[in-house]
């Protein structure tokens, strides 16, 4: 029987295969208990076009100091920031890769904030 983490990794592999076949840039999200990370990766998967995380100093100052990167408000800030960086890199449309995480809580907050900031997926 697969563990919960192995099941999540299997789901993420399948998603990445489907996205790679589309050939569109992907917005990849990873979360830990303390931080949330987002990156926009090129359609062929060779280059990171934009990235943002709560581990960045500017973001930590914006969200209110250290140790506050694992909440919904921080995820919203990262969603807005990744959308701005992606648009600056010339990317308007992406495929959302939630890496097997449930579309709920911090992952959903990041996605909604990125959509509101103008990223299409």
From Swiss-Prot:
One Gene Ontology biological process: translation
Molecular functions (GO terms): 5S rRNA binding; structural constituent of ribosome
Any single Gene Ontology cellular-component annotation: cytosolic large ribosomal subunit
Alphabetic keyword roster: Ribonucleoprotein, Ribosomal protein, RNA-binding, rRNA-binding
Coiled coil: none
Family under the similarity heading: Belongs to the universal ribosomal protein uL18 family.
Complex and partners: Part of the 50S ribosomal subunit; part of the 5S rRNA/L5/L18/L25 subcomplex. Contacts the 5S and 23S rRNAs.
Job description of the protein: This is one of the proteins that bind and probably mediate the attachment of the 5S RNA into the large ribosomal subunit, where it forms part of the central protuberance.
Protein name per Swiss-Prot or TrEMBL: Large ribosomal subunit protein uL18
Naturally occurring in which organism (per UniProt): Polaromonas naphthalenivorans (strain CJ2)
Lineage, opening ranks: Bacteria, Pseudomonadati, Pseudomonadota, Betaproteobacteria, Burkholderiales
């Amino acid at each position: 029987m697969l563990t919960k983490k192995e099941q999540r990794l299997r789901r993420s592999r399948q998603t990445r295969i489907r996205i790679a076949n589309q050939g569109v840039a992907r917005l990849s999200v990873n979360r830990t208990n303390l931080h949330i990370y987002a990156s926009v990766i090129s359609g062929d998967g060779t280059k990171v076009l934009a990235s943002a995380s709560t581990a960045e100093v500017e973001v930590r100052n914006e969200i209110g100091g250290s140790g506050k990167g694992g909440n919904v408000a921080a995820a919203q800030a990262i969603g807005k920031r990744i959308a701005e960086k992606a648009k600056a890199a010339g990317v308007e449309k992406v495929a959302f890769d939630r890496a097997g995480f449930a579309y709920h809580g911090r992952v959903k907050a990041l996605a909604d904030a990125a959509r509101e900031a103008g990223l299409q997926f």
